[in-house]
Amino acid sequence: MNITAIFVTALLLSMNKIGGEPMNYDAGVQLEEACHNDHLVLDHDMNFRSLTDEEINLICKVVMTEARGESNVCQEAIATVILNRWLNPEKYPDTIAGVIYEPNQFAIDENIKPDVGVRVAVHNAIIFYNTYQMQIPYQVYWFRADHYHEDLGMPYISIDNTYFSIDENALVN
C-alpha cells in the first residue's frame, strides 16, 4: 500500500461518520479514486485538481534546480509554493507551466534529471496539500536563498538556507 493509499484510507475512515451520518457516497468514491492516483491535489474548496506527468516533472525540475542539496522538507515547501500559486488564479497563472515560466519567478534547468529525493518531496507536497501535514500554509507564495524578500510579503519561516514569505493579507484573514 503506497503512502497515498494509507493517507486516503485514514481520511475515509475519519470521515465515515460525521455527526452520526454516513459519508456522502460520491465523496467516498472520489476519495477512494484518489488512492490510486498520485496526481490529484486537494484544493482550497476541497475539490481534487489533476496534474499531468509533464506538470509533475516540471515541478520536479524546478525543485531540483532551486533546492539541490537542501533537505526533503525544504524541497517539499518549494513544491508547495508552486502549488499555492497554481491554486490562486486571481493572482497567478492557472497552469503549472504558466506559474513556473512567469518571468523572473523560478530557476529551471530543462536538462536536469530530478533525483528520487526530489520526486518524493514533490509527491509529498501534492498528496499532503491542504492537509495538516503541509510544510507551509497556502498563503506562502515566495521564497529565496540566503534572506527574506524585502518587498514581497512578510517573513514566515526559513528552512535550511531558503527563506519563505507569506502574503501579508493572510495574517489579517
Model regions and ranges:
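Bacterial extracytoplasmic/cell-wall-associated proteins, especially those involved in peptidoglycan
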Residues: 31-173
